[in-house]
């Protein structure tokens, strides 16, 4: 029995399902989850000492690679001053200034401790600001596990085969309208049906929780126009895409300006940080300047602020954005070429530093229903064939993969060499 198997058996006695987030349990791909002991650069090492080239990157935050010296140094310098104060610090101002510089649509920003907290707070703010209750989200998109948003959600909910599940009151769900991603007509219909009741529309600009699905050319700008027409707050959820699709986020990449933006993952550099921000007139509607309440004991935590500031400062250096995108392109197109070589129905999609692998005859995947028609069983087999060769992909056919600046050309070629063997066995 491997050390990971021993640890998983032990974990299940004290932790529900043996994990602290469902996708980690490998329910989507089968087998025993890999327990990680340490990580460095593009590599993770499991409890048995086996190394893997990592394309999960803690589900996105590790854009510089694991254990980056700039982040570690910043954290070690901050720790001796105290771990948490529950009071304002200069570091939270500095990080906020950098965020507003990198993402111009954000005029004011509030720090929180997770992406879920960011989206939950943004939804509450939009409802308070507009005086309306209903929200629009998209089938297959995931915005965290708050009640209002766990309605036909993607991510772990899909991995478990529960697009919506128990524990979410019907009274919450009735206010959430679910439209089809990349289909403006479905959004128009929702607005026409409830023209004066919709507080906001929230969207993943690149849907990364039903794998990796970019928006069609007119989709995001069409959403912006509909929100303007009906007086709804337009929220772009950049928890995953922020600073990864482009330094200014997917909104910069696709040239669209939201009213509110939610952030997470990269903004913390590996520490638990989320944020939401946007137009001053909306953000000032939140406490203490406005009536909408939001608070957090660990919001703006000084250690997390130090890590986030170091991460964004390093990522902002010239050439990094382009390098990340180029490496991702090489990997994704390499996967596709190898699948074609072995006559495996397959397509790869990518934007900036994120990518998706689909086992399908379709040349392009554009929405949730098309994702559900892909061959998840074949992905599961591919996942394990890659894992055996020391390549760690997302353990779910519904999750995007992530490139980091630590991945070298040699790492990518080693990954593709492993993929060549894996595709040959499918």
Curated annotation (Swiss-Prot):
Keywords: Cytoplasm, Isomerase, Porphyrin biosynthesis, Pyridoxal phosphate. One of its GO terms (cellular component) is cytoplasm. GO terms for biological process: protoporphyrinogen IX biosynthetic process. Pathway: Porphyrin-containing compound metabolism; protoporphyrin-IX biosynthesis; 5-aminolevulinate from L-glutamyl-tRNA(Glu): step 2/2. Disulfide bonds: none annotated. It holds the Pfam family Aminotran_3. Its EC number is 5.4.3.8. Homodimer. Belongs to the class-III pyridoxal-phosphate-dependent aminotransferase family. HemL subfamily. This is Glutamate-1-semialdehyde 2,1-aminomutase. The lineage of its organism: Bacteria, Pseudomonadati, Pseudomonadota, Gammaproteobacteria, Pasteurellales.
């Amino acid at each position: 029995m491997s050390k990971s198997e021993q640890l998983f058996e032990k974990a299940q006695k004290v932790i529900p399902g043996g994990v602290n987030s469902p996708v980690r349990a490998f329910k989507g791909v089968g087998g025993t989850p890999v327990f990680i002991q340490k990580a460095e650069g593009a590599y993770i090492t499991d409890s048995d000492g086996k190394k893997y080239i990592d394309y999960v990157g803690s589900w996105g935050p590790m854009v510089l690679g694991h254990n980056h010296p700039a982040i570690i140094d910043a954290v070690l310098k901050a720790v001796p001053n105290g771990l948490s104060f529950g009071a304002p610090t200069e570091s939270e101002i500095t990080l906020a200034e950098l965020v507003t510089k990198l993402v111009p649509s954000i005029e004011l920003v509030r720090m929180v401790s997770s992406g879920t907290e960011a989206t939950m707070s943004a939804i509450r703010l939009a409802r308070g600001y507009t005086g309306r209750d209903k929200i629009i989200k998209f089938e297959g998109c995931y915005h965290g596990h708050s009640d209002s948003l766990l309605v036909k959600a993607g991510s772990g909910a899909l991995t478990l085969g529960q697009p919506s599940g128990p524990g979410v009151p019907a009274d919450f769900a009735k206010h959430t309208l679910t439209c089809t991603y990349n289909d403006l007509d479905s959004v128009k219909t929702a607005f026409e049906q409830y023209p004066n009741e919709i507080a906001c529309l929230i969207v993943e600009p690149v849907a990364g929780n039903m794998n990796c699905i970019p928006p069609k050319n007119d989709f995001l700008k069409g959403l912006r126009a509909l929100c303007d027409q009906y007086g709804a707050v337009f929220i772009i959820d950049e928890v995953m895409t922020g600073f990864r699709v482009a330094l200014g986020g997917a909104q910069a990449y696709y040239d669209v300006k939201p009213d509110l933006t939610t952030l997470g993952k990269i903004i913390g550099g590996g520490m638990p940080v989320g944020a939401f921000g946007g137009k001053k007139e909306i953000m000032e509607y939140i406490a203490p300047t406005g009536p909408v309440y939001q608070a957090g004991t660990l919001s703006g935590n000084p250690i997390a602020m130090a890590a986030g500031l170091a991460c964004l400062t390093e990522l902002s250096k010239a050439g990094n954005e382009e390098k990340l995108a180029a490496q991702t392109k090489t990997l994704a197109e390499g996967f596709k070429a190898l699948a074609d070589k072995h006559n495996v129905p397959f397509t790869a999609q990518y934007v900036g530093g994120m990518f998706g692998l689909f086992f399908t005859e379709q040349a392009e995947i554009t929405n949730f229903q098309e994702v559900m028609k892909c061959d998840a069983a074949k992905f599961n087999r591919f996942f394990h064939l890659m894992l055996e060769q020391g390549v760690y992909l997302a353990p779910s056919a519904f999750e995007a993969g992530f490139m980091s600046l630590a991945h070298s050309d040699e790492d990518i070629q080693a990954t593709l060499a492993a993929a060549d063997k894996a595709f040959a066995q499918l």
